[in-house]
C-alpha cells in the first residue's frame, strides 16, 4: 500500500513543522507550502491525498486557493481540512461544495486532532 501524502498549506513555519512531525510519526508523507502559489505547485508535484489548509495565508486567502483547486477537475476531489482561528464563524455545510470535509480550530486543537482529521477524511 502506498504511503498517503498530506499537503499542509500554512504560513506559520513552526506550526507547519509540528503538523509534519506528527503526521510522519503516524505513517503519512507530509509536505508543506507557505502560500497559495507554492501550494498549487505542490499539488502538481506531490499529488496529495488530502490538504490541510490555513484560511489566513500571507498574500492570498485560503478561500482563493479553494476556488482555484475546485476549478481544476483533476484535483477538485482532493479532500480539504481547514485549519483556522476562525472556526467558530464557519459552517461545514457551506464549505462542502469546495471539498472541505473537516474544520479544525487552531485555538483549541491538539496534534492528535490533526491525525484524527486526516484519518477521518481518508476513510
Residue ranges and their predicted role:
Residues 1-5, 110-123:
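Non-catalytic signal-transmission and effector/linker regions of two-component phosphorelay proteins
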Amino acid at each position: 500500500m502506498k504511503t498517503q501524502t498530506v499537503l499542509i498549506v500554512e504560513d506559520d513555519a513552526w506550526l507547519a513543522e509540528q503538523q509534519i512531525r506528527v503526521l510522519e510519526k503516524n505513517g503519512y508523507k507530509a509536505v508543506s507550502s507557505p502560500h497559495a502559489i507554492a501550494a498549487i505547485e505542490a499539488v502538481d508535484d506531490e499529488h496529495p491525498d488530502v490538504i490541510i489548509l490555513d484560511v489566513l495565508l500571507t498574500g492570498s486567502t485560503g478561500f482563493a486557493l479553494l476556488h482555484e483547486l475546485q476549478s481544476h477537475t483533476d484535483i477538485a476531489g482532493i479532500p480539504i481540512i481547514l485549519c483556522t482561528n476562525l472556526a467558530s464563524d464557519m459552517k461545514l455545510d457551506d464549505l462542502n461544495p469546495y471539498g472541505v470535509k473537516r474544520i479544525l480550530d487552531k485555538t483549541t486543537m491538539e496534534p492528535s486532532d490533526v491525525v484524527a482529521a486526516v484519518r477521518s477524511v481518508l476513510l
